């Protein structure tokens, strides 16, 4: 059984026992349980239910493993030709690591 769930504006395929890295969830504590009820699709033993826009009564229950995980560094380089202007910026996106405990449909 799996579900397509929307978390922080992104869609994920969720199955029980799976780990997900989603964009940082504000005020999240390690070990806390979070429920997401914006389920767009549920596949239960080959029986597919598509929501319009969401499936009623369906939810995905997750446990927060780590509330703050930093992604790989992305380097942004700006240069203006012939002027000697160079600028290098770095950015590391913050993520939250979740473990899906169950999919309720």
UniProtKB/Swiss-Prot annotation:
The keyword Hydrolase does not apply. GO terms for molecular function: rRNA binding; structural constituent of ribosome. Keywords: Ribonucleoprotein, Ribosomal protein, RNA-binding, rRNA-binding. The keyword rRNA-binding applies. GO terms for biological process: translation. One of its GO terms (cellular component) is ribonucleoprotein complex. This protein binds to 23S rRNA in the presence of protein L20. Part of the 50S ribosomal subunit. Contacts protein L20. Belongs to the bacterial ribosomal protein bL21 family. PANTHER family: 50S RIBOSOMAL PROTEIN L21, LARGE RIBOSOMAL SUBUNIT PROTEIN BL21M. This is Large ribosomal subunit protein bL21. It comes from Bacteroides fragilis (strain ATCC 25285 / DSM 2151 / CCUG 4856 / JCM 11019 / LMG 10263 / NCTC 9343 / Onslow / VPI 2553 / EN-2).
């Amino acid at each position: 059984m799996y579900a397509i769930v929307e978390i922080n504006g992104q869609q994920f395929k969720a199955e029980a026992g799976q780990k997900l890295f989603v964009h940082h969830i504000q005020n999240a504590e390690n070990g806390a349980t979070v429920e997401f009820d914006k389920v767009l699709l549920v596949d239960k033993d080959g029986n597919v239910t598509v929501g319009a826009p969401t499936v009623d009564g369906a939810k995905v229950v997750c446990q927060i493993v780590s509330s703050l995980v930093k992604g790989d560094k992305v380097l942004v380089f700006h240069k203006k030709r012939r002027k000697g202007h160079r600028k290098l910026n770095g950015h590391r996106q913050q993520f939250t690591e979740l473990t899906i405990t169950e999919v309720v449909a």
